[in-house]
Design a protein with these regions (language model features):
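Glycine-rich oxoanion-binding loops at beta->alpha junctions
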Residues: 84-86, 124-145, 191
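Long amphipathic alpha-helical segments
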Residues: 1-72
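Short glycine/serine/threonine-rich phosphate/pyrophosphate-binding segments
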Residues: 36-38, 107-112, 136-137, 156-165, ...
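Short, acidic/small-residue loops that bind anionic groups at enzyme active sites
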Residues: 75-79, 166-189
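Short glycine-rich or small-residue beta-strand-to-loop segments that form or flank ligand, phosphate
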Residues: 27-28, 52-53, 97-103, 152-154
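C-terminal binding/interaction regions
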Residues: 102, 181, 185-203
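Glycine-rich phosphate-binding loop
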Residues: 142-179
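Glycine-rich phosphate/diphosphate-binding loop of Rossmann-like nucleotide-binding domains
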Residues: 95-135
Length: 203
């Protein structure tokens, strides 16, 4: 444990041991990072690993990363709606199946962030979007999506009821994700969070 398994940059210490312990490299959070700091972390890290995942990246940060890696022959992909940057190739041999579900179209950015992260880490993902409880038939007409799932991720704002409904339909682990979508007494996602925490269906 005392061995140095990180890249020392002064302003950051990029963890090299994470990939050996967890099976995938440390994820880089772009949120709040200076572009110079972010690009330097990426440049140093990509020399030691075959792929990188950067989350909460703005377009300007992606452009800075792409410019920095311009001379290196490596694939750089930006998913604007999810604010994710993939560097390198994703796993081709997918393991398991995860369904990512969201209640409304406004919840898609959160759902896509989860879905793309799962794909980056090597899982097969089935997406089912805009199936909130206001039109429950949309969900019930697509329940076959849950067949063979190892896990389900459900994102919802407003009243946050969708995870409880899905929880009553599946036997695999379910991760409920509240979003800030809503108005009135939604309190920027707090209402959805409390609904999910008090769900009576197994999750």
């Amino acid at each position: 444990l005392k061995d140095k398994h990180y890249i020392e940059l002064g302003f950051a210490k990029y963890d090299l041991k994470r990939e050996k312990i967890k099976g995938f490299p440390e994820v880089i959070l772009a949120l709040g990072k200076d572009e110079k700091h972010l690009t330097e972390i990426v440049l140093k890290a990509i020399k030691r690993t075959k792929k990188l995942l950067i989350t909460r990246a703005e377009t300007s940060q992606y452009n800075a990363i792409k410019k920095t890696l311009g001379k290196i022959k490596i694939k750089v992909t930006y998913y604007k709606i999810a604010k994710l940057v993939y560097i390198g190739e994703t796993e081709k041999n997918k393991i398991g199946k995860i369904a990512v579900v969201c209640a409304g179209t406004a919840d898609v950015p959160v759902a896509e962030e989860a879905a793309l992260c799962c794909e980056f880490f090597g899982s097969r993902v089935e997406r089912l979007y805009d199936v909130g409880v206001a039109g429950i038939h949309r969900l019930l007409n697509n329940v076959e999506v849950f067949e063979g799932c190892n896990a389900v991720i459900v994102a919802a704002g407003m009243d946050g009821a969708l995870p409880s409904v899905v929880g009553g339909l599946v036997s695999c682990p379910l991760i409920a994700v509240p979003t800030s979508v809503g108005y009135g007494a939604s309190f920027k996602g707090l209402a959805a969070l409390l609904t999910m925490l008090n769900s009576c269906s197994v999750g």
